[in-house]
Amino acid sequence: MKKINFLVLAILASLFLAACGSHAQPNTSPGTGWGTGVFSTNGERIYFTATSDSGTAITYTGGPASNGWMMGGGQLTCASCHGTDGKGGVHSMGMMQTMDAKDIRWSVLQPEFDAAKFKLAVTQGQDPDGTQLNSDMPRWNISDQDLADLITYLQTIP
């Protein structure tokens, strides 16, 4: 009798855990503090989650996470620094440190940046004039297609 009770309890616990599990839907992420979890384009997904439609995380080196600014193991995304509206601005990243993130709406970046110069900024931390961006800007390991999709998304932000 004890074996049957244990078996029934184990089955019920398994069903409960399965019901509580995540049920991913196409074109969604587990959700972030920046987005709703539903994205209309790959570029928008990248901006808010640093993950491409393929499910691949877009990694980086440097940036606020390397400086200890992203406390609690937060995931760094474009929106983390440049905001949901792309306007950037001065904000605190913990421990009395501030960051002045650039406005990256495409309408503001033009004519200083084109796609090639934007790629250098995103992947190598290089400004259009050849100087290095400060250490707050991560150096992203992003594919050419994902970068093109991100630029297309930035072009839609008013």
What are these regions (language model features)?
Residues 1-6:
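Positively charged n-region of N-terminal signal peptides that target proteins for export
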Residues 16-19:
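C-terminal motif of bacterial Sec signal peptides marking the signal peptidase cleavage site
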Residues 21-23:
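Bacterial signal peptide processing site
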Residues 25-74:
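Electrostatic cytochrome c docking/interface patches
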Residues 34, 59-117, 136-142:
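Gly/Gly-Pro-rich "capping" loops immediately C-terminal to redox-active cysteine motifs
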Residues 39-42, 115-128, 135-158:
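C-terminal capping alpha-helices of c-type cytochrome domains
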Residues 46-49, 53-54, 108-122, 129-131:
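Short Fe-S-cluster ligation motifs
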Residues 48-52, 80-87, 123, 155-156:
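Detector for the c-type heme attachment site
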